[in-house]
């Protein structure tokens, strides 16, 4: 019998193998076609009597290509392994998650044998490779629900001692860690083994030990199970299982561990019990288990660590991190030590493997399981294609994309068809040599069928793609058309609205002026007697009419200017009218009434002229009626102005007007004189007016002068007015002068006025002078007034001399400078008018002081350098010289005299002073470049962003300024002297007054700052120290969406911390930035106690964008609360009105616990802030620093923040804003480089975000801050961990010593 040769046998076996491969490929092709058609019967025929591996192979294909009904059918009918791995080591659950098929993921998770904790080749669980956040959340939610339900059922069975149910649950817990026998219960603080041991249940203890309970697991109180029993049998049982576990070769290696270990502290204390946790490759320890959620004492990233274990000491091991971090740990037993050593070693090895480059499977092969990486890559590229878009871009109102699911499905089918086609072609090439082989025809048939199917699939895909493109194109065109129409209409509407408002205001102003003119004319005509009555003759002419309708001479621009200058200039007024405007009009604004003159020099002028007998009752009645009418007009005018946020217009008469009045006739009666003075709150007249007034007739009666003075709050006259008044005749009667003085609260006269008053005649009676002085609260006279008073004739009575007492200067005394470098305080006390001062002393004091002051131009109390925090008391009736800070100030505030720092404060100051290394260089005050950014239309870019969040806008770098939002937070620290001033003040109301001034001063730097600062990167930090003021500051970007920056600053006297969290939106006409975070201030006052203040910032807005003149406004209410005493302060930042009314204005009050006002606050946040007690004097709390022109409208303090000196650089972390390349490039004027660097940093940040979402990087957590609840207010806030300054000191010393230093756990973000 002949035996076949070995060659023939091998040839036959090879041929059979090829036929088998061909048959498998054909069956796979048939299976694909059945999956695509959804033919369940065909699938059943193909998988009938197939092995478990073949059915599992079909399951892998169906997950990628079949519908969910087909997958459920395979899972329920055929014997498959749902936890099997494919060629690329992916489970079916991994493939379903990578394909983004949530329906199939749900079907797999409901399978009883599924193990969702398995990891793939990249050491990732199934939920970590999900392509969408929704699918990832779904899978996580399922895990949590399953774990909770299983754990709840097991606890219930444990309490009931149902060992059968416990066995069933533990068997199903083999794959999923839903049950942890060593878990410490939150309520009892003990494990299952502790509870069973305390209950002396030996059977239950044995069951727990058999199923893996650890007898050396400590409870919340640090005790072992053996500590809860004295039964020797129970102790022996626990020890025996300990011995068995000790002798076991390979203890289980858990991924997460926690428990008590003894940690070496120092030679004095030795080992101390600490709670350790191992989670996500990080080993951390805490003082006890209760602190595990909040107070971490230290941690080591095992990626950078190594483990040291000496076999001679089986319970001791060391974990050594990078640098000097080293944990020397001692376990309770060798078993516990081995368990921890194995877990730590496994974590270190996993990190090392994760850092190795991935070696993919054979790329040349076209096995079925190679589809998963390709499909995952395709799906991932689709998912990451929109990574540059913000989250809010996905909520466009649209219908579902046509056939989206079918599109992805056909893509997978096409890939599998190509794979099968390659196999068939390869088989055909191998069988070409056998011409007569019938399999050749089968091969070509298969190729034909495959090509036909592939062609059909490609056509379907292209058709679906065309539909999608058509859909998106139509959607985009509609959006563009709507956006263009909206932008055009919005701009038109805004412009039309502005024009309508302007026309309305002009019409309303004209109506009011006309109404007042006719009212005055009607009142004058009503009182006009008949020609036969010689007691009062009133003549009207063109001059009277022109003067009657005076208001029409004012333009809107002039009216607005006067409104702004007078009504809202809180420090430009006197007599407690800080927020009111004095009615001020020129002499030609009303009817002029003159008295008859006994001098023949004066010639008549066109005016309202009368000839009257002032002694008659009718004349007096007419005078009273006219005075009443005029006062009514003034009151109505002032009310209207106030209601419209305006003020009464005032305008100084020109020289021509003065010259016209110089030659007024002398035959003018008392009524005319009364009417002129009554309705003319005069300002400083010019030379012509003074010259005209000098020639007034002397026969003015008493009543006329009295009325004139009652209604004329005069301002400072100029030289011409003084000269005119010097030649007043002496025949004025007592009554006239009395009436005049009652109505004229005069201000400081100038040199001309003083010279005029020196030559007043001596015939003035005592009564006139006394009444005049009663009604004229005068200010400090200037040099001219002093000269006039020195030459007063001796016939003046004592009452007349009393008028000079109000002109005496105010004594100024130096305030006490605080121990901290706070600025000098200046105060000028306002002295009330006194009617009983000694005339001689008052006059002499006025002369002596005015001689000195006459050399200086009278101006407001000047503030010295650093006077922004000074408590300056400004008198409404006084002016100080520029060097007034050298004089002493009489302060009503309660100051501590040179407060001595206690021991605790000194210690705090020393701790903070350590952080001042690197800040030895002088402060930078300017930039070397100019603001020559490329000019781009702001509206052209922003018009498509209306209604969106500003923080998610991507603007060109030319719209930025070379600062960061973190540095904007640091700009709040410019006026910290206010906090030092508050700290040294003993009065609680004055303390909160200075705190309020500090809160308002934070907005001073926002003026004209319309450019957008750079958005901080996640993890970016900024530090700033001020050695002269003794504080240090640190801020970190702890969140990116929404953007949140956590800040912390401290000095020896205070701690200031909070979060910069805003909600911003663009409304088309304006940007609105609304702060959300609360700011906390812990202030140490002179008694040593600490007070807590809190407040939230007000809304900032950039307006005027469409009109091309953007400006910054801050508005809203700020509530400052002292939680220690209950005192509060409310600041109201007035919004900018139409045409600039109320611009920058701040008003508020300090209230006691029973809501009683104690102090009033007013001023402007861009200039000065004042405080004033009710019915008391006001003090200057804060004044803005000088702001010279700088590039990008930056303040000198803001310019100093980004300075990077060689002394400072070694001390900074790699995340500091000063090291940011795009911001530095823009500061240097390299705008193209800044744009490219900005784009690079943003792409790098997006890439890290995607890696964190996919599980390739650990989740983000802030490095220097942690979220917590405030212990006093209960609000959420960011708690500083106090590690930054310690590590900074280590880094600086290492760099100065020439050593390398890596900041621990700090990301590379630049």
UniProtKB/Swiss-Prot annotation:
<dbReference type="InterPro" id="IPR018494">
    <property type="entry name" value="Oxysterol-bd_CS"/>
</dbReference>
<feature type="domain" description="PH">
    <location>
        <begin position="254"/>
        <end position="349"/>
    </location>
</feature>
<dbReference type="GO" id="GO:0032934">
    <property type="term" value="F:sterol binding"/>
</dbReference>
<dbReference type="GO" id="GO:0006897">
    <property type="term" value="P:endocytosis"/>
</dbReference>
<protein>
    <recommendedName>
        <fullName>Oxysterol-binding protein homolog C2F12.05c</fullName>
    </recommendedName>
</protein>
<dbReference type="GO" id="GO:0120015">
    <property type="term" value="F:sterol transfer activity"/>
</dbReference>
<feature type="compositionally biased region" description="Basic and acidic residues">
    <location>
        <begin position="528"/>
        <end position="542"/>
    </location>
</feature>
<keyword id="KW-0597">Phosphoprotein</keyword>
<dbReference type="InterPro" id="IPR002110">
    <property type="entry name" value="Ankyrin_rpt"/>
</dbReference>
<feature type="compositionally biased region" description="Basic and acidic residues">
    <location>
        <begin position="591"/>
        <end position="604"/>
    </location>
</feature>
<feature type="modified residue" description="Phosphoserine">
    <location>
        <position position="384"/>
    </location>
</feature>
<feature type="compositionally biased region" description="Low complexity">
    <location>
        <begin position="1"/>
        <end position="14"/>
    </location>
</feature>
<dbReference type="GO" id="GO:0030011">
    <property type="term" value="P:maintenance of cell polarity"/>
</dbReference>
<feature type="repeat" description="ANK 3">
    <location>
        <begin position="188"/>
        <end position="217"/>
    </location>
</feature>
<dbReference type="GO" id="GO:0120009">
    <property type="term" value="P:intermembrane lipid transfer"/>
</dbReference>
<feature type="compositionally biased region" description="Polar residues">
    <location>
        <begin position="607"/>
        <end position="622"/>
    </location>
</feature>
<dbReference type="Pfam" id="PF12796">
    <property type="entry name" value="Ank_2"/>
</dbReference>
<feature type="compositionally biased region" description="Basic and acidic residues">
    <location>
        <begin position="735"/>
        <end position="744"/>
    </location>
</feature>
<feature type="compositionally biased region" description="Basic and acidic residues">
    <location>
        <begin position="703"/>
        <end position="712"/>
    </location>
</feature>
<dbReference type="GO" id="GO:0034727">
    <property type="term" value="P:piecemeal microautophagy of the nucleus"/>
</dbReference>
<feature type="modified residue" description="Phosphoserine">
    <location>
        <position position="394"/>
    </location>
</feature>
<dbReference type="GO" id="GO:0015918">
    <property type="term" value="P:sterol transport"/>
</dbReference>
<dbReference type="GO" id="GO:0005886">
    <property type="term" value="C:plasma membrane"/>
</dbReference>
<dbReference type="GO" id="GO:0005737">
    <property type="term" value="C:cytoplasm"/>
</dbReference>
<feature type="compositionally biased region" description="Polar residues">
    <location>
        <begin position="837"/>
        <end position="847"/>
    </location>
</feature>
<feature type="repeat" description="ANK 1">
    <location>
        <begin position="54"/>
        <end position="84"/>
    </location>
</feature>
<dbReference type="GO" id="GO:0005545">
    <property type="term" value="F:1-phosphatidylinositol binding"/>
</dbReference>
<keyword id="KW-0446">Lipid-binding</keyword>
<feature type="compositionally biased region" description="Basic and acidic residues">
    <location>
        <begin position="876"/>
        <end position="889"/>
    </location>
</feature>
<dbReference type="InterPro" id="IPR000648">
    <property type="entry name" value="Oxysterol-bd"/>
</dbReference>
<feature type="compositionally biased region" description="Low complexity">
    <location>
        <begin position="785"/>
        <end position="808"/>
    </location>
</feature>
<comment type="subunit">
    <text>Interacts with dil1.</text>
</comment>
<feature type="region of interest" description="Disordered">
    <location>
        <begin position="1228"/>
        <end position="1258"/>
    </location>
</feature>
<feature type="compositionally biased region" description="Basic and acidic residues">
    <location>
        <begin position="824"/>
        <end position="833"/>
    </location>
</feature>
<keyword id="KW-0445">Lipid transport</keyword>
<keyword id="KW-0677">Repeat</keyword>
<feature type="compositionally biased region" description="Polar residues">
    <location>
        <begin position="713"/>
        <end position="734"/>
    </location>
</feature>
<comment type="similarity">
    <text>Belongs to the OSBP family.</text>
</comment>
<dbReference type="Pfam" id="PF01237">
    <property type="entry name" value="Oxysterol_BP"/>
</dbReference>
<feature type="repeat" description="ANK 2">
    <location>
        <begin position="88"/>
        <end position="118"/>
    </location>
</feature>
<keyword id="KW-0040">ANK repeat</keyword>
<dbReference type="Pfam" id="PF00023">
    <property type="entry name" value="Ank"/>
</dbReference>
């Amino acid at each position: 019998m002949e035996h076949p040769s070995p060659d023939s046998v091998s040839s036959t076996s090879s041929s059979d193998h090829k036929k088998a491969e061909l048959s498998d490929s054909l069956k796979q092709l048939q299976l694909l076609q059945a999956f695509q058609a959804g033919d369940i019967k065909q699938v059943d025929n193909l998988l009938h009597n197939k092995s478990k591996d073949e059915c599992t192979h079909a399951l892998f294909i169906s997950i990628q290509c079949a519908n969910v009904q087909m997958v459920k059918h395979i899972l329920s009918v055929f014997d498959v392994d749902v936890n099997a791995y494919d060629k690329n080591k992916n489970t079916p659950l991994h493939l379903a998650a990578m394909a983004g098929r949530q329906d199939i993921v749900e079907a797999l998770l409901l399978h009883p044998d599924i193990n969702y904790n398995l990891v793939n080749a990249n050491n990732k669980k199934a939920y970590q490779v999900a392509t969408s956040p929704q699918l990832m959340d779904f899978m996580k939610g399922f895990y949590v629900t399953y774990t909770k339900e299983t754990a709840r059922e097991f606890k219930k069975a444990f309490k009931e001692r149902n060992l059968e149910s416990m066995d069933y649950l533990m068997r199903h817990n083999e794959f999923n860690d839903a049950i942890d026998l060593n878990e410490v219960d939150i309520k009892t603080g003990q494990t299952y083994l502790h509870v069973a041991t305390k209950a002396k249940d030996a059977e239950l203890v044995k069951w727990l030990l058999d199923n893996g309970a650890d007898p050396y697991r400590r409870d919340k109180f640090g005790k072992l199970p053996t500590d809860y029993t004295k039964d020797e049998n129970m102790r022996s049982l626990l020890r025996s299982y300990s011995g068995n576990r000790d002798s076991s070769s390979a203890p289980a290696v858990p991924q997460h561990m926690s428990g008590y270990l003894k940690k070496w502290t120092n030679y004095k204390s030795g080992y101390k019990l600490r709670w350790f946790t191992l989670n996500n490759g990080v080993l951390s320890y805490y003082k006890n288990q209760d602190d595990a959620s909040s107070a971490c004492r230290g941690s080591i990233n095992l990626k950078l660590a190594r483990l040291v274990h000496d076999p001679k000491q089986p319970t001791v091991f060391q974990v050594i991190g990078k640098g000097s971090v080293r944990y020397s740990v001692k376990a309770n037993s060798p078993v516990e030590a081995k368990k921890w050593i194995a877990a730590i070693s496994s974590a270190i090895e996993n990190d090392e493997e994760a850092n190795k480059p991935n070696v993919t499977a054979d790329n040349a092969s076209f096995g079925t399981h190679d589809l998963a990486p390709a499909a995952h890559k395709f799906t991932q590229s689709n998912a990451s294609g929109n990574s540059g878009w913000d989250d809010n871009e996905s909520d466009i109102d649209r219908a579902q994309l046509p056939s989206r699911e079918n599109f992805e499905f056909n893509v997978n089918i096409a890939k599998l068809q190509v794979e099968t086609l390659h196999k068939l072609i390869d088989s055909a090439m191998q069988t070409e040599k056998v011409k007569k082989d019938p399999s050749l025809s089968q091969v070509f048939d298969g190729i034909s069928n495959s090509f036909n199917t592939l062609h059909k699939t490609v056509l379907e895909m292209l058709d679906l793609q065309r539909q999608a493109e058509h859909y998106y194109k139509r959607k985009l065109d509609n959006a563009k058309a709507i956006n263009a129409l909206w932008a055009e209409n919005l701009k038109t509407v805004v412009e039309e609205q502005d024009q309508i408002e302007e026309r309305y205001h002009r019409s309303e102003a004209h109506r009011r002026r006309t109404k007042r003119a006719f009212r005055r004319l009607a009142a004058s005509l009503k009182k006009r007697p008949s020609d036969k009555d010689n007691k009062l003759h009133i003549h009207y002419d063109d001059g009277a009419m022109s003067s009657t309708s005076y208001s029409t001479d004012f333009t809107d621009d002039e009216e607005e200017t006067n409104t702004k200058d007078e009504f809202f200039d809180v420090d430009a007024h006197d007599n407690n009218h800080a927020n009111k405007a004095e009615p001020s009009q020129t002499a030609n604004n009303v009817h002029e009434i003159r008295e008859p003159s006994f001098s023949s020099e004066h010639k008549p002028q066109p005016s309202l002229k009368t000839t009257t007998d002032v002694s008659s009752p009718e004349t007096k009645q007419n005078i009273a009626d006219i005075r009443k009418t005029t006062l009514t007009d003034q009151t109505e005018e002032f009310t209207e102005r106030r209601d419209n946020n305006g003020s009464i217009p005032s305008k100084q008469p020109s020289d021509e007007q003065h010259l016209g009045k110089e030659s007024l006739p002398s035959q003018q009666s008392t009524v005319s004189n009364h009417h002129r003075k009554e309705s003319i709150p005069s300002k400083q007249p010019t030379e012509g007016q003074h010259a005209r007034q000098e020639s007034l007739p002397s026969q003015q009666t008493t009543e006329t002068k009295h009325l004139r003075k009652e209604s004329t709050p005069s301002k400072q006259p100029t030289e011409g007015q003084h000269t005119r008044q010097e030649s007043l005749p002496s025949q004025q009667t007592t009554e006239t002068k009395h009436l005049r003085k009652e109505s004229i609260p005069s201000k400081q006269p100038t040199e001309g006025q003083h010279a005029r008053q020196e030559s007043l005649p001596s015939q003035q009676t005592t009564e006139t002078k006394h009444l005049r002085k009663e009604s004229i609260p005068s200010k400090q006279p200037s040099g001219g007034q002093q000269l006039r008073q020195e030459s007063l004739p001796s016939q003046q009575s004592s009452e007349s001399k009393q008028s000079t007492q109000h002109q005496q200067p105010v004594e100024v005394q130096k305030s006490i400078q605080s121990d901290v470098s706070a600025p000098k305080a200046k105060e000028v006390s306002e002295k009330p008018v006194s009617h009983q001062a000694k005339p001689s002393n008052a006059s002499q004091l006025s002369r002596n002081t005015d001689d000195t002051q006459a050399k200086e131009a009278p101006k407001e109390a000047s503030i010295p350098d650093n006077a922004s925090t000074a408590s300056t008391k400004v008198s409404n009736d006084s002016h100080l010289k520029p060097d007034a800070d050298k004089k002493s100030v009489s302060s009503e505030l309660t100051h501590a005299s040179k407060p001595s720092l206690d021991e605790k404060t000194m210690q705090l100051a020393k701790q903070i002073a350590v952080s001042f290394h690197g800040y030895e260089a002088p402060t930078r005050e300017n930039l070397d470049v100019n603001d020559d950014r490329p000019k781009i239309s702001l509206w052209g870019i922003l018009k498509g962003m209306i209604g969106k969040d500003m923080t998610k806008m991507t603007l060109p770098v030319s719209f930025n300024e070379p600062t960061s939002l973190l540095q904007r937070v640091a700009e709040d620290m410019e006026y910290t002297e206010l906090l030092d001033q508050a700290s040294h003040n003993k009065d609680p109301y004055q303390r909160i007054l200075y705190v309020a001034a500090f809160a308002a001063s934070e907005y001073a730097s926002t003026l004209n700052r319309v450019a957008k600062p750079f958005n901080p990167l996640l993890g970016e930090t900024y530090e700033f120290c001020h050695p002269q003021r003794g504080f240090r500051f640190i801020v970190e970007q702890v969140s990116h969406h929404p953007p949140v920056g956590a800040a912390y600053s401290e000095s020896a006297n205070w701690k200031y911390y909070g979060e910069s969290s805003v909600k911003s939106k663009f409304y088309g006409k304006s940007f609105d930035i609304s702060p959300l975070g609360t700011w906390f201030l812990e202030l140490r006052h002179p008694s040593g106690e600490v007070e807590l203040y809190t407040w939230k910032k007000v809304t900032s807005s950039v307006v005027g964008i469409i009109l091309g003149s953007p400006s910054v406004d801050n508005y809203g209410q700020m509530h400052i609360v002292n939680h220690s005493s209950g005192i509060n302060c409310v600041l109201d930042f007035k919004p900018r009105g139409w045409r600039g009314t109320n611009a920058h204005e701040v008003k508020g009050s300090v209230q006691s616990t029973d809501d009683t006002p104690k102090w009033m606050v007013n001023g402007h946040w861009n200039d000065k802030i004042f405080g004033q007690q009710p019915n008391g004097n006001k003090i200057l709390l804060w004044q803005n620093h000088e702001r010279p022109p700088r590039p990008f409208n930056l303040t000198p303090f803001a310019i100093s923040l980004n300075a990077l000196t060689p002394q400072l650089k070694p001390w900074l972390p790699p995340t500091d804003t000063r090291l940011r390349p795009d911001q530095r490039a823009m500061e240097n004027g390299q705008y193209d480089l800044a744009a490219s660097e900005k784009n690079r940093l943003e792409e790098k940040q997006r890439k890290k975000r995607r890696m964190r979402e996919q599980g390739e990087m650990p989740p983000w957590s802030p490095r220097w801050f942690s979220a917590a609840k405030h212990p006093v207010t209960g609000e959420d806030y960011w708690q500083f961990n106090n590690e930054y300054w310690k590590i900074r000191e280590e880094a600086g010393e290492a760099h100065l010593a020439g050593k390398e230093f890596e900041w621990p756990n700090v990301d590379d973000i630049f």
